[in-house]
Amino acid sequence: MEDPDLVATNLSPAGVKDLLRKDLDARDPWNISSCEYEQKRLHAIMELCLGGRTLGDVLEIGCAAGALTERLSIYSQSLTVVELMTEAIAKAQERVNNSDIIWHEQDVCQMDLNAKYDTIICTEVLYYIHEKERLRGALENIVQLLRSDGQFIFGSPRNAVCRSWGHLFGAEAVLELAQSRLRIVDLRRINGGLPGQDCVIAKLTRR
């Protein structure tokens, strides 16, 4: 279903924060715990993360309310979270309650981390970027943080869904940009049968 708020919003970092703040205030943000489609999406992400390997040192970009963070904390050797919103970090910390997790309030386009990671996960984040060069820069940041034998798990609604919401770069567009630096090794499509419930989850490695 098209969301008029998304169509009308100025998607600067401040605009993204304003847009997401009201969703984070809900008891079950984005219906992640109660929606079958969201559960399938989380399952596919974890399946791609864990397929045939350990997670090692993990970077999660965009934690929302912590549903994926909670799962990653169980399987990772170390877990670092980069999130744009203070409110999202607080919500995720309340849910996960793990003092070993490292939290950074940063923009994916301007990440400043002195580390390398075995697994980087970035889902439901990159479609908020509306300039191709900023998106290319965010992807380059991710590549630079990924170890040579690491894996990048990417997830996003498909192009048609994102465009119906007023976003320019959905899953197919991001993956096309990413393939100059990364190769796709596995890809899943999740379709919940309702408007807006159509996404891609992909595993990529460095070229």
From Swiss-Prot:
Function: SAM-utilizing methyltransferase involved in nod factor synthesis.
An example molecular function term from Gene Ontology annotations: S-adenosylmethionine-dependent methyltransferase activity
InterPro entries in the cross-refs: NodS, SAM-dependent_MTases_sf, SAM-MeTfrase_NodS-like
Residues annotated as signal peptide: none
Pfam families referenced in this protein's UniProt entry, alphabetically: NodS
Protein name: Nodulation protein S
Listed GO biological process terms: methylation; oligosaccharide biosynthetic process
Tree of life domain: Bacteria
Enzyme's top EC category: transferase
Keyword Transferase recorded: yes
Assigned protein family: Belongs to the NodS family.
EC number(s) given by UniProt: 2.1.1.-
Keywords of this entry: Methyltransferase, Nodulation, Transferase
Encoding gene (name): nodS
